[in-house]
């Protein structure tokens, strides 16, 4: 008997993100509600969460704990079985799995924590791999594999690819028809490996990339991806753009960074912000001055202007040291 007939999956929801923000935690709860309702309509009897339920590996505030328990209960009541992968953010230590932040799962008998690799029938489900566990992957023959994997050449976000550290590689999954994984938030695939995309956009590293949500897989079929229609979104615009076409560009629950490319006063800029935020129910509208500094005495030259985000990410990616975890540094920066 197969582990599932029709499975619904999501990943990397990160309860407790943004210092335990109530707004973010409520977004997470609203997403889980939508996920369960959608899975029920699609007749999914099984759910798999692919890792990173919590954001902070060392501390979880009381409000976040309450959201965690209520949403684990919601998942438990919505499915016959829920397989729950421990991601790196769910572990107190990144290099071992002995302590995790989701021990609440023991309250729900049909929520099954994946603390060690589980193979049942033609399905393998793996937690965040530690030490040399990756070396066992080529020996696994399962048709379907679910995990929380860190694979080189895939994008950690829209700009930065995961560097190759000479360990787990895409060719190690030659025996699988499909590999589904969390960890990198951008939805992407290469051959048989699918990063399904996290639950919804979390920060400006996700700006303009709304392909997030859930995945549904019927045994023997092809994966189907669905985007949460009420998700918060992130955008970067120029002021001239939003003044010209506000109705087309500004949306409900939007976080918006706007570069001031017009000659306006502080009072005018503040008026625009105070008008647009309530009118379009924006979560955030940040007005950023456009700074261009050119030496008047110099001859004309081509200047390549880079955003602060680009500069910081390039500098982190250029670090050549085994003492630093580039992926972790990028994750910390993106969530500032």
Predicted segments — roles?
Residues 4-6, 17-117, 172-176:
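Core catalytic region of metal-dependent phosphoesterases/phosphodiesterases
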Residues 158-223:
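Conserved beta-sheet core of the metallophosphoesterase superfamily
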Residues 14-18, 55-58, 85-96, 131-133, ...:
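Active-site environment of divalent metal-dependent phosphoester hydrolases
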Residues 8, 122-124, 215, 233:
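Conserved beta-strand elements of the Class I
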Residues 9-11, 46-52, 81-88, 112-115, ...:
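Active-site neighborhood of phospho(di)ester-bond hydrolases with catalytic His/Asp-centered motifs
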Residues 1-18, 326, 332-335:
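Acidic, histidine-bearing metal-coordination/catalytic regions of metal-dependent phosphoesterases
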Residues 41, 218-336:
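Accessory, non-catalytic peripheral segments of nucleic-acid enzymes
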Residues 68, 86-171, 196-199:
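Conserved catalytic scaffold of divalent metal-dependent phosphoesterases
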